Each structure stands twice: as structure tokens, then as C-alpha cells.
Amino acid sequence: MKFYNREIETETLQRIERLSKDNAQMTVITGRRRIGKTTLIRHASTEIPFIYFFVGRKSETLLCAELTDIVKETLGEELGTFNSMSKLFSALMNISCRRNFTLVFDEFQNFAQVNDAFFSDMQDIWDRTKDNSRINLILSGSLDSMMNRIFDDRKEPLYGRATNRIKLQPFTINTLKEIMSDYHPEFTADDLLAFYMVTGGVAKYVEQLVIQQAFTKEDIVKSVLGYGSYFINEGKDVLSDEFGKE
């Protein structure tokens, strides 16, 4: 599926990228699961080296090894071996004092499970280094409750550190009309209503219907309720992510 909408968000991220050539930027991007944050971030990156890192719920040592490999591949920088994400982040901030690049931590809130001291360490490193840094740091997260606490709670170490905030919203009905017009120009009002009711404008759900070529009301219902449907376990997965598994 081609990239739709998000013109304002794309322009904003590209402006921030340009600003990072002279001053460090910390951008926080929030929005519900499957809304298209990662796709937007990748789409908006244009001119400088781009490091994308998904913060999985793994051991800190393993995450460090994965990130150092990505840094070596992207920047050609040999960082050695780390078992502390704080020390690795400090090394990356030092590199950013001589090189401009984008660093994305996707599902940033997961660091709370990896090492709950990381946020305090990050605040200290950022405060000491940012004035000489040219990093374009993007911190993306799907769990609004945790992301809001990390960045909006005055008691939290990263409170007030973000230089930019973006909250990604679902596609509007006009964008859904555009998508339907591109893929199924003869759509009816009932088709559009079903398309909206099932997806809610969530980019991943829209993409799934496009992949299934489900554009009529009848085909949309079959795609959602049919055997092996992507949507069958989605509600449970969303609740598990937000509130934890039993």
C-alpha cells in the first residue's frame, strides 16, 4: 500500500531533521498500536544516516549487541562490547558531537522492563552532552499511559527534555475515501462505512484490508471473520500489550 496522508507530520519530522544539523533534537512520537508511527518515521527520514532500533523485551546485553551491530553497519563506527545501554547511549551521544545522524528508539517505554535506571542515566547523559550534540533522537511508543508518565510526570527524569512532541492520529474519513477511490472507485456509502467501522482509520488495519482486496461490505466482513483472519486475535493482543498478559 502506498503512503497516505501524514503530510503535516512528515514535514514536521523533516524540519526537525534539518534542525538537528545544528542542535540536538529529542522528538517523542506517541499513538496507539498499529497507527503507523514506524512507517511515518522511516518515510520522513531523508538526508542523514538513519539508525532504527526496536526496543524488544530482551536482556540488556543482547540489546546492546544488536544496537552496536546496527551502528557499525550504518555509521561504520566500531564501538566495542557493551552490557549497559546507558554506556552505549553515552557513546552514541559522543559520536553525535562530530556526526549528524538520526537515532530511533521504537517502543521506547520497554526500557522500563530492561533496566529501570536507564531513564535517569539518559537524562544525565542528555543534559551533559546535548549542547555539543547534533543527534536527531526520536523516541516512539505505543503505550500512551507509560509514555505520558515518562515525559509528562514532573517526578520522572525525562520530564521537560523533549524538544518536540507528535501524537499520531488515525486516518480521517477523507483519507479513507481516497484509499477506497484508488483501489475500488465504485465503492458505495455502505462499503465506506464498513471500511471505517472495521479499521477506525488505523493504518495497519487499512493495509490488511487492502492486501485482502476487501473493499465491499461483504468482502470486509469475510476478511474480518474468516478463518485465519488477522483481526481474530488483535483485540486480545492490544489488551495484552496495554495491561500485560495473565
Go through the PLM ranges and name each one:
Residues 1-246:
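Phosphate-binding site recognition
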